[in-house]
Amino acid sequence: MSSSCIEDLSIQDNQWYRIAHEMLGLAGIEINGSRPFDIQVKNPEFFKRVLQQGSLGLGESYMDGWWECERLDMFFQRVVSAGLEKKLPHHLKDTLRIAAARLTNLQSKKRAWIVGKEHYDLGNDLFTLMLDPYMQYSCGYWKDATTLEEAQEAKLRMICEKLQLQPGMRLLDIGCGWGGLSAYAAKNYGVSVVGVTISAEQQKLAQARCAGLDVQILLQDYRDLHQQFDRIVSVGMFEHVRPKNYRTYFDVVERNLAPHGLFLLHTIGSNKTDMNVDPWINKYIFPNGCLPSVRHIAEASEGHFVMEDWHNIGADYDRTLMAWFERFKQAWPQLAERYSERFERMFSYYLNACAGAFRARDLQLWQVVFSPKGVEGGIRVAR
C-alpha cells in the first residue's frame, strides 16, 4: 500500500471519512480496496471536499490527483446505480446555478456560442484521433457492428433510412459537427445538404470534408435559418438547447420543414424532468447544456408535429464512449505536447463517467421521427 493512502495517514476516525466509507459501501465500493472499481485516495481532504461539493468536488479532486481508480467506468456504474449522487448535499453554487437557469436563458443567441468555443473548438487533432473517419461525436449503433467505424456508419445509414432520403431532396443538418452526416447523406443518397454549426473549428474541417459534394456548411445560430427543406435532422445538438428554448427550437424546425417533410431528432435524454445539469460537466465539458426528458420533448413538440417513431439506443452509448476512451488513451502520446496532464485526467474522467451512467441506464439516447401532420398510413422506420 502506498504511503499516501489513507490507512497510512491514520484518519479513519475522521467524520468525513466515516460518512464517505458508509456511502460508498452502499455501492459495494471500498476505499483503497483491491478491485478495479475501488478507489485509491491520495489526499485525506478528499472526503470533505466531495461531501461538501458533490459532483464538482468529485471531478475536480480527480483532476487534481487526489484519488485514482483503475476502472472509472465501473466505479460510476456502481455510484449511479446506487443513487449516491442523489445522497450528496447540494453545493450552494450548484443550487444558485440551477435557480438561475430557471430564471434566465443560458442559451440565448449570444450565449449559444460559448459551447462551440469551449468544447468543440478544443482542437480538431484531439477529435480526429479519438473519433471514427466520419468524426461522429454521438452514439454509434452497435446492433450488428463490431468496431467503432461500423457502428457509426450503421448509425448514419439508419438515420438516412428513417428520413427516407431520395435524390434531389434538400436536407438541413442542425448542429452538423464536422460534417460527417452531411457528407454521408450527400454522397450516398444524392441529397443537397445545408449544415449549420457554431464551432469555427468544426466548420473548417466540415467544409474540407464536403468539398466536391452538394453540401454547404454555415457558421451561424440555427434560429437564424429561414429556408425550406424536405428533411431536417439534428444529431447531438438538442442537449445544448435548454428548456427555455425548446418551443423556439421546434418553431424553427417547423418553419423550415416542407409540409410533407420528416424531422429526426437524435438526443441524449434524462429519466426525469428537471434542469438535469451535472455541475462538473457544466463547468468543464458542456457549458450551459441540459438533458431533455420524454416530457420535455413531448410538450415542446405538441402542436408542431406528429410523433411517428421513438427509438431508444441508449445502451449503445456505453460501448461508444469506451471505444472513444481506448482511442484517446492510445492517442495521448501524440496529444501530450499540446494538452496538459490535468486535461488528460479531465477528459478521461468525462468519458468514463458518462459510460458508467449509460451502463446504469440513468441516461438514454433517443431517435425521434416527426412529421408535420402525420404520414398517411404511417411509416416503417429502419432499425
Question: Which ranges hold each PLM region?
Answer:
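Conserved class I S-adenosyl-L-methionine
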Residues: 168-175
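Conserved SAM-binding strand-loop segment of SAM-dependent methyltransferases
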Residues: 211-222
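A short acidic, Gly/Pro-enriched loop at the edge of an enzyme's catalytic core
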Residues: 223-232
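Conserved beta-strand signature within the Rossmann-like core of class I S-adenosyl-L-methionine
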Residues: 260-268
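Conserved SAM-binding loop of SAM-dependent methyltransferases across substrates and taxa
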Residues: 178-189
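A short glycine-rich, Lys/Arg-flanked "PGG" loop and its adjoining helix->strand segment in the class I
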Residues: 247-259
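Substrate-binding/catalytic lobe of Class I Rossmann-like enzymes that use SAM or dcSAM, i.e.
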Residues: 268-378, 383
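Feature captures hydrophobic
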Residues: 1-153, 158
